[in-house]
């Protein structure tokens, strides 16, 4: 990564790649990939350890876990879960604003003040006219509050504060640091996106900082970051709060249960290997999950979502029709048995029935790697860690035959094979069923044109398309000339270049 400032690194997008579509996760992670290679970037041959290592500016922006294991390690990264790109091309990460005062005005709803914690400094920091009036109200009890003690705002105190604001005008009430909740109208505005260089001036607490039911920070000291360093700071210094513990990692890493207990090297392998899963015949959502699975499935674009709220008019294997509340019919076409770029089978299955009530954005059909609108990469199987007469020596495992009989890990792949008939110096190639030195048994699945029938079952070595190519002729004996004149035998001047099933394919 090229250095912009001491605490920032830049990335850029180069070239066009074929999208990875085997499963929802691989498509999503491919679209969120970052690269430091290419024109204007680094070279993998000359990139040292320093530019590959995790940097403090990566926090909440580039995942420290998900990266390739080969020569591109550290040069190819992944966007963190909540990271986004600003107008100038730099990565930003969100933080929650920690409020240290509460605005009290004549129009303030007293209920919004209930639950805030008043401290020994609250009365001292009030404007002088408000302090004088407060001495004859419920706030007079604050004079006896000792340092470190907190008094919760009750309905009575909240009403007195609003009454003071009506008499003396709007004022700021010093309270225990707190963050707003999702039900607060200020919540969205309190979420700030910052690039790496701007966050250096703030004390930022971790997402696991202890909060009470009203969002107050109740500990006197909290673990925080300031100017790129981790430290323990008094709660009064905290300016921002992480939005989530998973904001430092990518989507793939956030799918690993109990990630905090994993060794970093094994977590890297797990995040990369999840993308390599192939879609199964019967996807099954995991029993042990992290809560990100449903959002990953939606954001991948492979799950069909309802265009409007309404009632399902029809639900078939190829189309779902929803009658919206606006009276219009909304058609949702499903993708059936389409080959992906990696040769896997793209297939969408309806999960709603006729007459069901749906809302806008609700999943209507699963993809090949989801179940019930939730990411499903594998199967829930019962595992035992035990000895079994040496059958599981070292890295060997024993499997129940039910896994095979019930097609638990069976997948469908669609391969595309092409053949071309070219004009050569010795003459044109020909697609034909008349192939020299090939028995009738090998031609049984070919039509008159030499092309395999649709639905034929083939194995490795079977002919898919018959093709012959001219070859240089050698002098023929009189017997060969006679046979060629009588039977039209071409064995002497053509060779078999038919397209056959590759080894290992059935």
Language-model features and meaning:
Residues 4-5, 9, 16-506:
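Intrinsically disordered, low-complexity regulatory segments
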């Amino acid at each position: 990564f090229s250095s912009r400032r001491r605490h920032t690194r830049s990335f850029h997008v180069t070239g066009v790649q074929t999208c990875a579509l085997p499963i929802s996760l691989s498509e999503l992670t491919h679209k969120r990939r970052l690269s430091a290679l290419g024109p204007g970037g680094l070279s993998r041959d000359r990139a040292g350890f320093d530019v590959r290592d995790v940097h403090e500016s990566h926090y909440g922006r580039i995942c420290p876990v998900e990266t390739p294991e080969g020569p591109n390690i550290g040069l190819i990264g992944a966007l963190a879960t909540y990271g986004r790109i600003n107008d100038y091309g730099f990565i930003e990460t969100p933080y929650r604003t920690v409020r240290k005062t509460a605005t009290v005005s004549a129009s303030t709803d007293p209920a919004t003040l209930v639950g805030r914690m008043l401290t020994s400094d609250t009365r001292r920091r009030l404007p002088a006219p408000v302090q004088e009036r407060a001495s004859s109200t419920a706030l007079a009890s604050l004079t006896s509050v000792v340092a470190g003690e907190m008094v919760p705002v009750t309905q009575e105190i909240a009403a007195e504060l609003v009454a003071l604001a009506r008499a003396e005008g709007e004022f700021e009430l010093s309270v225990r640091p707190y963050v707003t909740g999702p039900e607060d109208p200020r919540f969205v505005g309190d979420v700030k996106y910052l690039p790496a260089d701007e966050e250096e001036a703030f004390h930022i607490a971790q997402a696991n900082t202890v909060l009470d039911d009203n969002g107050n920070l109740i500990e006197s000291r909290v673990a925080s970051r300031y100017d790129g360093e981790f430290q323990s700071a008094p709660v009064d210094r905290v300016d921002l709060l992480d939005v989530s513990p998973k904001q430092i990692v990518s989507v793939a890493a956030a799918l690993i249960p109990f990630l905090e207990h994993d060794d970093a090297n094994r977590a890297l392998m797990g995040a990369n290997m999840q993308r390599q899963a192939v879609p199964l015949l019967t996807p099954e959502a995991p029993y042990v999950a992290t809560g990100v699975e449903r959002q990953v499935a939606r954001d991948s674009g492979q799950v069909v979502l309802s265009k409007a709220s309404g009632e399902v008019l029809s639900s078939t294997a190829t189309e779902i029709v929803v009658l919206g509340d606006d009276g219009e019919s909304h058609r949702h076409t499903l993708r059936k048995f389409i080959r992906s770029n990696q040769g896997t089978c793209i297939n969408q299955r309806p999960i709603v029935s006729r007459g069901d009530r749906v809302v806008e954005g609700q999943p209507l059909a699963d993809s090949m790697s989801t179940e019930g609108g939730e990411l499903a990469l594998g199967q829930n199987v019962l595992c035992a860690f035990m000895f079994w007469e040496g059958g599981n020596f070292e890295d060997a495992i024993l499997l129940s035959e039910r896994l095979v009989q019930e097609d638990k890990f069976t997948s469908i792949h669609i391969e595309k094979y092409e053949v071309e008939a070219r004009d050569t110096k010795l003459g044109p190639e020909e697609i034909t069923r008349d192939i020299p030195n090939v028995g009738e048994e090998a031609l049984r699945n070919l039509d008159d044109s030499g092309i395999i029938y649709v639905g034929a079952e083939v194995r490795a070595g079977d002919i898919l398309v018959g093709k012959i190519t001219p070859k240089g002729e050698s002098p023929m004996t009189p017997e060969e000339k006679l046979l060629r004149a009588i039977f039209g035998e071409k064995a002497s001047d053509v060779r078999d270049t038919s397209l056959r099933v590759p080894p290992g394919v059935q």
